[in-house]
Amino acid sequence: QLYEHSVAQVSGNLWFAPICSDGTPRGVFCIEERNGEWQWHHRMLGRGADDRLVVWREGQVDGSDEYVVVKVVGWDDKWRVEWSENGVSMGAMEQVEMYDPDYMHYVEYEADYGKKYLERLRRSATLRSHYYRLRRTVENSEITITATDRFGRKFEAKL
């Protein structure tokens, strides 16, 4: 079988931005082969080896005021992303296409470039589908998000 991967630059976007325009954080793409079995993952710089989830609480993402939004770094269409609330399984999270909130924040508020270059950065942002969202049914409830990759590895975030 053949798999194609788009790999982010370890330096971020064009050596300047801490994040690529598709939302992939600075990092390295690790490919491992053992006895003919292949596995891979994206390792974010400055984060734990098993960190794959970036979570924004309600109100932190424009247009998603009522939602917790999750980015799954290294995602492909074989991942499962589920959640529980106060220990009760709520099933699969809703998958959404969006521009990366961190990249857009960087372009709008942190990048210190000329107007022409900033416009180029804005245009380089791409809609991606490695985002999921949930809406709590109980205010201030305890949320657990569990993402399982194609290899059966589980990654968890708690709010």
Give the residues covered by each predicted segment.
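Solvent-exposed serine/threonine-rich low-complexity stretches and specific carbohydrate-binding patches
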Residues: 89-122
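Binuclear metal-dependent phosphoesterase catalytic core
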Residues: 2-75, 79-86, 120, 124-158
